Amino acid sequence: MTRNLVRFPVQLALAAVLLAAPALAQQPGLTLPPDGDNQLASVTQGIGLVRVTIDYNSPDVHGPTGEDRRGKIWGTPVAHYGMANLGFGTCGDQCPWRGGANENTVFTTSHDVKIQGQPLPAGSYGLLFLAGPEEWTVIFSKNHTSWGSYFYDAKEDALRVKAKPEKSAYSEWLTYEFIDRKPDRATVALQWEDLQVPFTIAVDNIADLYLDQVRRELRSSPGFNWQNWNAAAQYALQNKKNLEEALGWAEEASTSSFNGQENFATLATLADLQAANGKAEDARKTMDRAVSHPTAGPIDIHRYGRQLQAQGKNEEAMRVFELNAKKHPNVWPVHVGLARGNAALGRTKEALAEARLALAQAPDDNNRQGIQALIKELEAAGGSSQ
């Protein structure tokens, strides 16, 4: 009887411990400083609508205990060359370097991109490296959730590309820096100690991405005004993309009773897109309406005349310059247009007279110098210097 009484409390205590174990396991951990003084860091770069982010832990040249590791980083256990056996995990002697510290270094792109010219789909990837004195291999692994590179598996590679290490300014902390930026590409470099390893990230279809976004926006509140329809049409025209669709946008901007407004800007865009779609006669008629429209200012008409001159249509250009003079007499840059129009038709004396009138109206030094140069050319061509 006594033996059973002793056993019963022991059994109860053991059961209590077993029941408590899951609850203890579910307790949250503490928030403490990062291991080894490796700072958590992140960098994001926009390439048009594309967003590229690298999340990483950043070790420093002076190690956790303060020792100076300068000259002892590359090709050592700190940042080993090639594959190595890290003594832990499942990668054996085929473990790349994680390009940072602690957790996996993660490369995320919102859209498909090209790395060093090779395609990489949108998504998140473990960013790993096979370092070397002359050449590196940059690995994008589909596994971005494992700790470090301890569980690396080459079968999970999404992409491998080559990169060249370069000497660089000293960097105490391992850093990922976007060192070159263009509208459709950027170069990111891993920088640490006296070395950097750059690789390019490019977006082939920047204009297509913007046009996809524009299509969505025109179906919402941005589509409630003519300015956005006109801007969308202009963007497609400038990039020579979806010109037939853009013509529809231009028509919406200039004619729609709900969204549109007929003015010089919308008619000029419509004319440009009619021309781009092979409708030359429609474009000419539309542009005639544009320059005759009450909203057509003297600079608008002058620019159209200069555009015609650039196309070799000097007689048409002269008619436009004369229309400008009729609509906006003695206003800048009407006399400039008449000077250039007459000069293109060989009427040197008339051109010189208009140029002198334009010189008196020049609004700034740049325009004044341009007209003075034109006057000298006309005088040398046989006009009077009086």
Label for each model-derived stretch:
Residues A23-Q26:
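Boundary at the C-terminal end of the N-terminal hydrophobic targeting segment
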Residues Q227-E252, S257-F258, E262-V334, R340:
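Alpha-helical adaptor scaffolds
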Residues M1-F8:
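N-terminal secretory signal peptides that target proteins for export/translocation
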Residues V214-S221, S254, F258, V291-S292, ...:
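A conserved position within tetratricopeptide repeats
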Residues P9-A21:
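Bacterial N-terminal signal peptides
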Residues Q238-K241, A276-G278, G346, N366, ...:
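Short coil/turn linking the two alpha-helices of tandem helical-hairpin repeats
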Residues P298, L352-Q386:
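Terminal, low-structured helical/coil segments at or just beyond the last alpha-helical repeat
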Residues D55-A122, L128-N228:
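Extended, well-structured beta-strand/loop surface patches
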